[in-house]
Amino acid sequence: MLENIRIILVETSHTGNMGSTARAMKTMGLTNLYLVNPLVQPDSHAIALSAGASDVIGHATIVDSLDKALAGCGLVIGTSARSRTLSWPMVEPRECGERSVQQAEHASVAIVFGRERVGLTNEELQKCHYHLNIPTNPEYGSLNLAMAVQLVSYEIRMAYLARQDKTEQKTDEVEYPLADDMERFYHHLECVLNDSGFIRKAHPGQIMNRLRRLFTRARPEMQELNILRGILSSVEKWAKK
């Protein structure tokens, strides 16, 4: 199950953070590291700071875009230390661990960590189902990247162990769309809204952002998403008559 959980680092600028992150992950049983467009490549310094977790670095998946790192994921959680102009569903580390372990039984999960200095962009955060905030001391909330990964990895580990100890009744499994399914839906929706004149192609403004937030909050099941796509296709056919 834990192998289905991806720790994703976006545009990391220090190899030491890669090594320390690998160490934090492996101590909690996580091994699936993704590096999105890293500004430096893993080196001997990263290996040294991994302290025996060099295999995590050696098997890390390096991609050039966040979309590629999120492909196939059914749940995406992005870390955010800053308040944003557009509110989003929030979780703290404990809930993040519980949701991640629950979803990892059925599909891949992504926990996304941003750049060391500026974190994730608003556009990147809009690709996430939830934003993760670590409730640190308001007078001194300075966490480095590896510390944040360690805290989240610990909560994932605790949720995993708790789930292993429980004998749960089997319920009907619900299939949720993957991140790439949702991106295709948003593209389809934006095309229909453009063609209908509801939004302007060059200036979609906040409408698409708010629609993303709406559907992220609702988190439609796969069958429900197919219905929505069918409605959009029906509107397109009607408009061509």
Swiss-Prot record:
It is found in: Cytoplasm. Its main location: cytoplasm. It is an enzyme of class 2 (transferase). It catalyses: cytidine(32) in tRNA + S-adenosyl-L-methionine = 2'-O-methylcytidine(32) in tRNA + S-adenosyl-L-homocysteine + H(+); uridine(32) in tRNA + S-adenosyl-L-methionine = 2'-O-methyluridine(32) in tRNA + S-adenosyl-L-homocysteine + H(+). It comes from the Bacteria. CDD domains: SpoU-like_TrmJ (cd18093). S-adenosyl-L-methionine binds at residues 79-81, 114, 134, 141-143. InterPro entries: Alpha/beta_knot_MTases, RNA_MeTrfase_TrmJ/LasT, SpoU_MeTrfase, tRNA_m1G_MTases_N. One of its GO terms (biological process) is tRNA nucleoside ribose methylation. Pfam families: SpoU_methylase. One of its GO terms (cellular component) is cytosol. GO terms for molecular function: RNA binding; tRNA (cytidine(32)/uridine(32)-2'-O)-methyltransferase activity. Gene3D superfamilies: 1.10.8.590, 3.40.1280.10. Keywords: Cytoplasm, Methyltransferase, S-adenosyl-L-methionine, Transferase, tRNA processing. Its EC number is 2.1.1.200. Belongs to the class IV-like SAM-binding methyltransferase superfamily. RNA methyltransferase TrmH family. Catalyzes the formation of 2'O-methylated cytidine (Cm32) or 2'O-methylated uridine (Um32) at position 32 in tRNA. Homodimer. PANTHER family: TRNA (CYTIDINE_URIDINE-2'-O-)-METHYLTRANSFERASE TRMJ, TRNA/RRNA METHYLTRANSFERASE. This is tRNA (cytidine/uridine-2'-O-)-methyltransferase TrmJ. The gene is trmJ.
